Each structure stands twice: as C-alpha cells, then as structure tokens.
C-alpha cells in the first residue's frame, strides 16, 4: 500500500504544476471512480448514495459522496486542503530584453523561499484565455520542457553572498528564456498562441490574457539511503489533496463525505474560490436548502483541515518548542494554537487522536514556540464561515515553501489510513 500510494503521489505531482492542473488531475481521478460533475449554473438533482463534484475557477474543487443516511442524523465528514503553492507568476506585460536576452517579469505568489529558485531548470504552465472564431475560450497549457532559468551571480562578483543575501524580486528574479538578436522583438502572447497550437492543435486568433506560473521541471523522487523521504515541489499542499482524495475513494461509508480543495490559501484565501469565499457554504446549502436542516447538519459535522506541518529540522531544532518537535515518518501532526491560528480544540483533537489510536497510526502534536509567530490554514476560516467543528492536522515536512520540499515516505500511508477511518466513522463527537 505504501509504495503504491507514494508512486501515485509522484505521478499526481508531475501532472499538477499549477492549481488549474491539480484540479484537472483531481477531476480525472474522480470521474474514473464514477463521480459526476455538477454545474453551479444549473439546478441540481442529487440522490442519496450519489457521487458528485463541483469546480470553481478551474482551480478549486469540492467532491461529495452523498450518504444513504441523512446528514441530519450523522452529519457530514469533511476534509479540507488547498491546491496552490508559492511560485513565480508571469506579469501581464512581461517581456524584458536586456543584454541580448529575452526575460519575463514575474510577481512572487505567496510566501516563497526565493533563493532555491536560482539555477533551476524551469518550465511554464497555467491557464490561457483567447479568442477563436469570435468566441472567448480558455485552455490549460504546460510547456513541460525546461525553457527558462534564473542564473545566480558568480561569487566572484558577489563576495558577501554567503553572509546573507537580500533578493530583490523585481530585478533579480526575471528568468532568462532565450538569446535574441539586436533589434528582434519577441511577443510573449504570440509564443502562447504557438503553444496552444502545439499542445492542443487549436488555432487561436489572439491570446487575450493568462495566469501562468514557472515551476521546477525536476520530477518528484524517493530519496535517502533507505528511501525514507520524498523530495518534490508543491508538497504543500498537494500532499494533503492527494491523501484526501485517496481516503474519499476508499471510503465505503453510508455517511455523507466531502473533500474540498481550495485555491488561494497561500495569499489569504479571500477570493470567490478560496476558503474565505462562499464556495463550500453555497455548495452545502444547495444540498441542504432548508435553513434549519442546514444548521442542524453542520452542528453534527466535523472538518479535518489538512495542511503540512513543520518537521523538526536537525540543523535548526531550536526553532521548535522543545516538547513539540514533529518528526518525519512519525505520523500526522495535530496543530494547536490557543490564539485560534489553528481551529483545533480539545474535543476535535481528542477525536482525531482516538481515530489514530484505533487505526494504529502514530500521531504527534505541534505548537509554535511562545516567542514566535504562528502561521494559519483554511481551518479557522472554514470553521468561522460554517460554524463547523474543526481539527487542524498535517504531515511534517522540511523546507516548506521552497521550490523543492521534503516529507517522509511512510507518512502518506499514515494519513490516508486515518482519513479513510474518519470518512468511515459512524459517530462524530
């Protein structure tokens, strides 16, 4: 089971360089399992036992397995994650031609670690909107090949580079794509038109706009002397998306189960398809249109907010509270913050710990050092929007928000096992 899950994760990561591609990958797997698309613009006719999914903006998705039992009796079992990761996004008018090189201006998306982006073989992917035969259409593209690089400045020209380096994203991050002759001008949108023709065999009249991200072309890999680790881009938080998907597909429960994977978590979640938007609430209200029934069902429900946790790094162990240092390959982490940066409380933490014990899955706890600030997740946002009880958990990782992150190769199986048990659980606290 562990090897198959890890192989599936690596394949999923490769197919998902952007939130748009991640959502498409989730859709492909859900449809293969018999899930049917619900269009938000149409009226819905759902049936008990039905399997459905909803997307918004092509970058957020909610998968729903309606139970044979009413949510008024058993509640709804929800797992939440996010599809986006810190990266470099291409600007609207990006062309830069300096010193005979074609470069693209980029904007930093989210709280990225910038130094690891240098000297990487980069490609470009995302969504392109264009006009064809008088109609406006959109399509996903992925160059796949390494088409760009951000070369470092040689240490001979930057003698203090190893003493601390403040990266200027405006001047130092534009990737180099090609050399160009003297007065030659390159039109980036024309390049996108060519890519649409190559990848999808369609002839766009004009590219109108785009949302494109650079990404590292190095594939995810199982590494370490004993294969103890998975090194990959976008583990935060496609690791949790994939774990939630596998658990949902495994769940043969009579209860109603939901997986929600939102975009824009890394930039605050405040969007139409983000966790701070109305997507999940509107979807659940359409399934439970009576206001009284909706509140009753939500108060019987529970959300597991799954987002990676900071594993204790052997070189920087003092960055953790001495009693709360999550270890890689030691199971999922319950995240606690009394200032509500995480939504966990004693009842939801206790229930998750109970599930882990019943499934013989190791479980850990994390609380930030008292002299450091604490990050947050979609957990508190979802809890405050829905009024649903929530526990924040995640798998321990190193190098969070780097272009290449690291997690334990045993932990995915741990998380899938306990989330499957959660979906199958007959009673919630």
Curated annotation (Swiss-Prot):
Keyword field contains Protease: yes
Disulfide bonds: none
SUPFAM superfamilies with a match to the protein in the record: Aminopeptidase/glucanase lid domain, Zn-dependent exopeptidases
Keyword terms, alphabetized: Aminopeptidase, Hydrolase, Metal-binding, Metalloprotease, Protease, Zinc
InterPro entries linked: M18_aminopeptidase_2, Peptidase_M18, Peptidase_M18_dom2
Cofactor(s) needed for function: Zn(2+)
Pfam families: Peptidase_M18 (PF02127)
GO cellular component, one term: cytoplasm
Amino-acid positions noted as binding Zn(2+) in the UniProt annotation, renumbered to this chain: 82, 156, 401
EC number from the UniProt entry: 3.4.11.-
Gene Ontology process terms (BP): proteolysis
Molecular function terms, GO-annotated: aminopeptidase activity; metallopeptidase activity; zinc ion binding
Family of the protein in this entry: Belongs to the peptidase M18 family.
Protein name (record): Probable M18 family aminopeptidase 2
Organism: Pseudomonas entomophila (strain L48)
């Amino acid at each position: 089971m562990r090897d198959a899950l890890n192989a599936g994760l690596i394949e999923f990561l490769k197919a998902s360089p952007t939130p748009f591609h991640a959502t498409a990958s989730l859709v492909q797997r859900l449809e293969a399992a018999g899930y049917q698309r619900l269009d938000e613009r149409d009226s819905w006719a759902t049936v008990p036992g039905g399997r459905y999914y909803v997307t918004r903006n092509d970058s957020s998705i909610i998968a729903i397995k309606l139970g044979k039992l009413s949510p008024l009796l058993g509640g709804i079992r929800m797992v939440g994650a996010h599809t986006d990761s810190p990266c470099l996004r291409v600007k609207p008018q990006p062309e830069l031609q300096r010193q005979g090189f074609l470069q693209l201006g980029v904007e930093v998306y989210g709280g990225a670690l910038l130094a690891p982006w240098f000297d990487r073989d980069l490609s470009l992917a995302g969504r392109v909107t264009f006009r064809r035969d008088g109609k406006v259409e959109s399509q996903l593209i992925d160059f796949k090949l390494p088409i760009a690089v951000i070369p470092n400045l040689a240490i001979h020209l930057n003698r203090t580079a190893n003493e601390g380096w403040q990266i200027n994203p405006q001047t130092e991050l534009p990737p180099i794509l090609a050399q160009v002759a003297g007065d030659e001008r390159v039109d980036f949108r024309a390049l996108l038109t060519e890519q649409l023709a190559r990848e999808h065999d369609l002839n766009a009249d004009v590219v109108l706009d785009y949302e494109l991200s650079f990404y590292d072309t190095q594939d995810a890999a199982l590494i370490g002397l004993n294969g103890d680790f998975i090194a990959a881009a976008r583990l935060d938080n496609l690791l949790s998306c994939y774990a939630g998907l596998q658990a949902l597909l495994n769940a043969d429960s009579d209860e109603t189960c939901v997986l929600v994977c939102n975009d824009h978590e890394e930039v605050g979640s405040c969007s139409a398809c983000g966790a701070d938007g109305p997507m999940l609430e509107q979807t659940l209200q359409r399934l439970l249109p009576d206001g009284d029934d909706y509140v009753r069902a939500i108060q019987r429900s529970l959300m597991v907010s799954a987002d990676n946790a900071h594993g204790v790094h052997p070189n920087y162990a003092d960055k953790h509270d001495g009693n709360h240092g999550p270890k890689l390959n030691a199971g999922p982490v319950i995240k606690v913050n009394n200032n509500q940066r995480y939504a966990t409380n004693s009842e939801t933490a206790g229930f998750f710990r109970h599930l882990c014990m019943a499934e013989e899955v190791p479980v850990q706890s994390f609380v930030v050092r008292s002299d450091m600030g604490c990050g947050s997740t979609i957990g508190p946002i979802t809890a405050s929007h829905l009024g649903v009880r929530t526990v924040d958990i995640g798998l321990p990782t190193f190098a969070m928000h780097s272009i290449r992150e690291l997690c334990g190769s045993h932990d995915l199986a741990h998380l899938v096992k306990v989330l499957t048990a959660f979906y199958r659980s007959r009673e919630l606290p």
